[in-house]
């Protein structure tokens, strides 16, 4: 079991990138690793020592690499198990320590200097780094219990508390020059248990356009060092002292570029807000002329460099732009709130009108149903009255025919009566003639008696004939009177029928006019229903059914680029609904 403290980690791909010099600070933490026994262990190769390369990365992705000692008690061979909670990741590719951010120089055992110079190379009096295919073991330790690691090899494992620290250990094969000497004091400044680690990049010599910077790693050692040789009884207690040459200076050029970029973005934000305010109908004069009186140059202290003045100028400009943007945002929200209030009022009015129109439509539909029922009943009554009128007209026609027949029979009877009267006169004249003739020829009582007998018989015959004719005439007269009475009665009934027909025709005309009006209203309603589902027709009369609403909503300018805002100086337009009158005929 061993304890170590690490800061953070970067992968081996980041070792070849040169990072800017910054101060690396971290908090010391102690974690324990347990060896996991391997299934098959093979003896290490001869004349080969396994050297571990540690890679650390700080808060700003600053990379520091260090070599573990040859006499470390940790894993000495890639064939032995690594003290980690993860499986070993093996890669068989050529790997050599050529990093521009880390080179190890020979130094005293108490101090380890790491120079950031790509021109230097690794020189050791006893160790020679050879370029041949190596076997690399990397182990990862993620120390953040609140966040699951991004690496697929670390998911599901136990994490240590910390601030997302990943430690990568690389083991390389290093060929020995002297096989008799396995260790040397010159390379004994290696792995220790760190109690209060602090990595400081201290610039020893800063020149203009110079890329050589020295990084010092200082550590406080609280554990006992490892043995120099396998059988050597002596032990070395090493301490790495912190070398702090003062705070590192920031790059003013980088800071100025950052301020310029922030100023540009702030200006772009202000112009974007101003454009949106113009699109919703706001005024921009109040915002552009408020801060013009402020003199930025008077606020800049004297005696500073031009670069510092420019940075302060950027900061003051950003402050002014931020103030303007704040006022623009507040004005925009006030305009939006006002427009939303107008929209809410118009929406409420439209909903009320919609409810009213729906009620009117329901009422008209009920009226339409009632009118249809009334129309059906009127049609039924009209059919019945027409049938009765046809029957009465047929009866009148039959009565007229009977009257004509009676008139013809009466004329025939009158003609026969005239014939009988004519025959009577002829007989009387003949009787006179016979009397005269008899009186001239026969004068005696027998003739007189015979003449009286013939006269009496003739008188009886005439009397009987007259009685028969009188009875027949009286009978015919009674029949004629009866016919006349019947005709008069029938004529009175016909006049009653005609009066009733006149009343019915007037009632029918009124019903027809009512039906016509109702059919017009029905056609209007049907046209409204049809126009509500389809586009309104072109013809017809136009009626205003809604109230006056606002037709301009500047808030819509935020949604549509082609929206044209009209100032509220003009009168509000009126929304109308076109209705088309179509005549609807009854089936």
Curated annotation (Swiss-Prot):
GO molecular function per UniProt: actin filament binding
Transmembrane segment boundaries: none
Free-text tissue specificity from the UniProt record: Expression absent in adult ovary.
Cellular component per GO, a single term: adherens junction
Pfam family, one: POF1B_HlH
Function statement: Plays a key role in the organization of epithelial monolayers by regulating the actin cytoskeleton. May be involved in ovary development.
Subunit structure: Interacts with nonmuscle actin.
The protein's name in its UniProt record: Protein POF1B
Gene it is expressed from: Pof1b
């Amino acid at each position: 079991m061993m304890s170590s403290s690490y800061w953070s980690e970067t992968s081996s791909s980041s070792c070849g990138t040169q990072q800017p010099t910054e101060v690396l600070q971290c908090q010391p933490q102690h974690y324990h690793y347990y060896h996991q026994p391997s299934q098959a262990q093979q003896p290490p190769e001869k004349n080969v020592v396994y050297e571990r390369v540690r890679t650390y990365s700080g808060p700003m992705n600053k990379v520091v690499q260090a070599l573990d000692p040859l006499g470390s008690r940790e894993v000495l061979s890639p064939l032995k198990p690594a003290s980690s909670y993860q499986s070993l990741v093996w890669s068989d590719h050529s790997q050599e320590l050529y990093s521009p951010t880390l080179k190890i120089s020979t130094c005293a055992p108490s101090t380890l200097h790491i120079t950031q110079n790509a021109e230097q190379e690794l020189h050791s009096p006893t160790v020679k780094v050879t370029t041949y295919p190596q076997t690399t073991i990397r182990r990862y330790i993620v120390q953040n219990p609140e966040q699951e690691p991004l690496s697929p090899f670390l998911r599901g494992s136990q994490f240590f508390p910390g601030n997302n620290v990943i430690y990568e250990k690389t083991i390389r094969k290093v060929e020995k020059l002297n096989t008799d000497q396995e260790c040397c004091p010159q390379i004994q400044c290696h792995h220790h248990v760190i109690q209060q680690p602090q990595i400081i990049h201290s610039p020893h010599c800063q020149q203009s356009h110079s890329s050589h910077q020295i990084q010092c790693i200082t550590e406080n050692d609280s554990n006992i060092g490892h043995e120099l040789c396998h059988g050597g009884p002596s032990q070395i207690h090493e301490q790495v002292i912190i070398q702090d040459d003062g705070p590192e200076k920031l790059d003013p050029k980088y800071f100025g570029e950052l301020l310029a970029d922030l100023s540009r973005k702030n200006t772009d934000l202000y112009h974007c807000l101003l454009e949106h305010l113009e699109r919703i109908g706001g005024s921009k004069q109040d915002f552009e002329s408020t801060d013009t009186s402020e003199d930025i140059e008077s606020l800049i202290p004297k005696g500073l460099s031009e670069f510092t003045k420019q940075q302060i100028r950027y900061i003051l400009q950003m402050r002014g732009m931020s103030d303007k943007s704040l006022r623009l945002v507040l004005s925009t929200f006030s305009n939006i709130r006002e427009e939303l209030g107008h929209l809410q009022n118009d929406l409420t009015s439209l909903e009320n009108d919609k409810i009213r129109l729906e009620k009117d439509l329901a009422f008209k539909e009920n009226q339409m149903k009632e009118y249809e029922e009334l129309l059906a009943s009127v049609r039924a009554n009209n059919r019945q009255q027409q049938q009765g009128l046809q029957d009465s007209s047929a009866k009148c026609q039959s009565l007229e025919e009977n009257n004509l027949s009676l008139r013809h029979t009466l004329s025939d009877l009158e003609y026969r009566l005239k014939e009988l009267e004519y025959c009577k006169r002829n007989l009387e004249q003949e009787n006179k003639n016979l009397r005269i003739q008899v009186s001239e020829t026969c004068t005696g009582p027998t003739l007189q008696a015979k003449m009286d007998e013939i006269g009496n018989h003739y008188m009886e015959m005439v009397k009987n004939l007259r009685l028969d004719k009188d009875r027949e005439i009286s009978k015919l007269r009674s029949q004629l009177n009866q016919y006349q009475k019947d005709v008069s009665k029938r004529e009175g009934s016909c006049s009653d029928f005609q009066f009733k027909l006149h009343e019915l025709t007037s009632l029918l005309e009124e019903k027809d006019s009512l039906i016509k009006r109702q059919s017009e209203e029905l056609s209007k309603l049907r046209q409204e229903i049809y126009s509500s589902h389809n586009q309104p027709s072109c013809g017809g009369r136009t009626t205003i059914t809604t109230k006056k609403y606002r037709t301009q909503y500047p808030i819509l300018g935020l949604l549509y680029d082609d929206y044209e805002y009209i100032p509220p100086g003009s009168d509000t337009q009126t929304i109308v609904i076109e209705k088309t009158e179509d005549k609807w005929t009854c089936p």
